[in-house]
Amino acid sequence: MEHFKNKVLTIAGSDSGAGAGIQADLKTFAALGVYGASVLTAVTAQNSIGVQDVRIMDEDIINSQIDSVLSDIGASAVKTGMLANSNVIKLVSKKIKEHKIQNLIVDPVMVSESGDALLEEEAVMSYVRDLI
């Protein structure tokens, strides 16, 4: 990874169909010659038909993943995707400030391509207050 000039950390959910989420982010980074690291916020069971199940990761493991990557590998930028709820949004905001991240790309994933909700309704304002 040291031969990569740019490193990007994606903080997002996993899409088992690989059409979105961390899987799509990492494929995009690789295609652009950028080293991609990831923090998993949620695991989804989804395919081209829709989302069958969503499990939000515990905040402690999200916190640990962020610290693990940023304290060692580092990141030229952080991209967020599916953050799922207000608590995760607040945690990610806190960690971005704590690690003094200068380049932030916010993709407020709210709904899947098939129309399934991927963000709790009350969390929309958390994006505005805490992350954007």
What is the predicted function of each stretch?
Residues 80, 85-132:
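Conserved beta-alpha-beta core of the PfkB/ribokinase-like small-molecule kinase fold
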Residues 1-77:
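Small-residue (G/A/S/T)-rich helix-start motifs and N-terminal tracts that mark the onset
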